[in-house]
Amino acid sequence: MSIEVFNESGYDGVNEEMLIDVLSFALGEMDIHPDAEASIHIVDLDTIADLHVKWLDLEGPTDVMSFPMDELTPGYSRPDGATPGPAMLGDIVLCPEFAAKQATKAGHDLAHELALLTVHGSLHLLGYDHVDPAEEREMFALQNELLADWYDNVEARGVTYQPKPSGAGAFPTAADRLELDEKMEADDSGFGGVES
């Protein structure tokens, strides 16, 4: 995988190596061509709020947005799968300031929240969505499976980014995330609405 990270946020404490690792792992598990390209943009609250309005017509900042480019179907390595060449998957945009507040409310650290959001964004790049309840359950289950498997993979490789979290907010269901969104909306921080 060719993954580039552009930190335009000025926010300290973002482990870019970890973001590349988790995205590469998730895309590999989804059988995306190993020469595919993607980028991660780390932005501030104002930038993501502008993108949120421009592309989703929703006011206020959010945690993650994805901008797919080439339409792909996971499974290039399956015997029955097509053999597409490398592709430009698209861009994942993360807002660590928003994610930090969300992580605190969910009961885990920023690094885990950014890893979770990176996996979430990668699934959006691959065409997954959470518009209806069935899609939402499927996407969040896959997100949690990929994230848990990544932690196991990291541990097996002897790499330490942060310990694998536990607790209700660590690997959230769609309902857990909805509850977190409601807490964020009710917060008086001025962050506005949430749409991930």
UniProtKB/Swiss-Prot annotation:
NCBIfam families named among the record's database cross-references: rRNA maturation RNase YbeY
UniProtKB keywords: Cytoplasm, Endonuclease, Hydrolase, Metal-binding, Nuclease, Ribosome biogenesis, rRNA processing, Zinc
Compartment(s) where it occurs, according to its Swiss-Prot or TrEMBL record: Cytoplasm
Name of protein: Endoribonuclease YbeY
Protein's organism: Corynebacterium glutamicum (strain R)
GO cellular component: cytoplasm
Task performed by this protein: Single strand-specific metallo-endoribonuclease involved in late-stage 70S ribosome quality control and in maturation of the 3' terminus of the 16S rRNA.
EC primary class: hydrolase
Claim: Repressor is one of the keywords in the record: no
Binding locations of Zn(2+): H120, H124, H130
Main location: cytoplasm
GO BP annotation list: rRNA processing
PROSITE patterns: UPF0054
InterPro entries with a match to the protein in the record: MetalPrtase_cat_dom_sf_prd (IPR023091), YbeY (IPR002036), YbeY_CS (IPR020549)
